[in-house]
A protein has these predicted regions:
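C-terminal structural segments of small proteins and small subunits
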Residues: 47-72
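Residue-level recognition of oxygen-bearing side chains
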Residues: 22, 37, 64
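Short Gly/charged-rich anion-binding patches and loops
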Residues: 3, 36-37
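Thiotemplate assembly-line natural product biosynthesis machinery
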Residues: 1-16, 67-73
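Phosphopantetheine carrier-protein modules
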Residues: 9-28, 47-55
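Two-component histidine kinase catalytic core, primarily the HATPase_c
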Residues: 33
Length: 73
């Protein structure tokens, strides 16, 4: 999970990914940020996130996003 957080901070360095639980709902991640994160996940983890999984519930916290990636491996 630490490496995953580092990857997220590379995309959006000023966000507290360890503690934030409403990244999308609070507007901390915008559409271009989400595209960048999905691209990084594909590059680093070899995981393709289907468009029907790109929903706030899966993106509102680093933990939720990490669980999604693990489920898709």
């Amino acid at each position: 999970m630490d490496e995953f957080i580092k990857m997220l901070k590379k995309v959006k360095p000023n966000v507290d990914f360890e503690n934030e639980e409403a990244l999308v709902d609070d507007g901390l991640l915008e559409s271009l940020d989400i595209i960048s994160i999905i691209s990084e996940i594909a590059d680093q983890y070899g995981v393709h996130i289907p468009s029907d999984e790109i929903i706030p519930d899966n993106l509102n916290s680093a933990e939720a996003l990490y669980e999604l990636v693990e489920d898709l491996k």
